[in-house]
A protein has these predicted regions:
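Cytosolic, long alpha-helical scaffolding segments
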Residues: 1-214
Length: 214
């Protein structure tokens, strides 16, 4: 019975590592699509999101099965509980990638391109590094760099505020391009949300470690 329990935990761990790789690739490809306004790549990401959600739900099901059927010890229970919550944030992160791709379609549909907000690439890269770092910490079982990840979330928040101000000014100066700038408002908001979800994952990593920061 114990062997089956350990095997189930190992299988879930392998699934989570594979999911992390898929998430990292999706985030990287989403930026490529956004930077180049590549409708084809955006469509692949948008329509492929359901496959990622299916993987997430499969991991959730395995996690719940272990929690309910295998009688985990206290340490493992905290790990399983944290994994369930982390999976929700992972699903939302990839949903936001699909959301961004949806607005790439809008940017292309509304006519000629407009200049994206200053610092958009840097904002996206900081967010992407947060996701990569938290998934690495989850899979490696550590809590190093938690404070650094949270500091990055503050950087994304500041970039979000600055971008909103810049887009508002451009809407006034270029009223013919308001629809495109609205798309950028939503894109920037999704990036900010992705960083928030990454920050949420740090809380559950700390919960799992039973070493919450004061």
């Amino acid at each position: 019975m114990r062997d089956a329990y350990v095997e189930s935990l190992n299988e879930l761990s392998q699934d989570m590592m594979q999911l992390a790789q898929i998430v990292e690739t999706t985030i990287a490809n989403t930026w490529t699509a956004l930077e180049s306004l590549d409708n084809k790549l955006a469509s692949e990401i948008y329509h492929g999101n359901e496959d990622i959600n299916t993987r997430v739900r499969e991991c959730m099901k395995k996690d719940l099965t272990i929690s309910l059927m295998q009688t985990p010890v206290a340490t493992d229970w905290r790990h399983l509980m944290a994994t369930q919550k982390i999976l929700y944030d992972i699903e939302r992160i990839t949903d936001n990638c699909a959301d961004i791709c949806h607005y790439i379609f809008h940017l292309n549909k509304e006519g000629g391109p407009v200049t994206p907000p200053t610092g958009l690439q840097e904002m996206y890269q900081v967010m992407a590094s947060m996701v990569v770092d938290v998934l690495r910490l989850y899979n490696e079982g550590g809590i190093d760099d938690i404070d650094l990840i949270r500091d990055k979330d503050d950087i994304v928040d500041m970039a979000f505020t600055k971008s909103m101000e810049e887009i508002s000014e451009k809407m006034v100066k270029e009223p013919n391009h308001v629809r495109q700038y609205i798309s950028y408002v939503l894109i920037v908001k999704y990036i900010e949300r992705m960083a928030d979800h990454a920050s949420n994952i740090t809380d559950w990593i700390l919960y799992r470690s039973n070493n919450m920061l004061k």
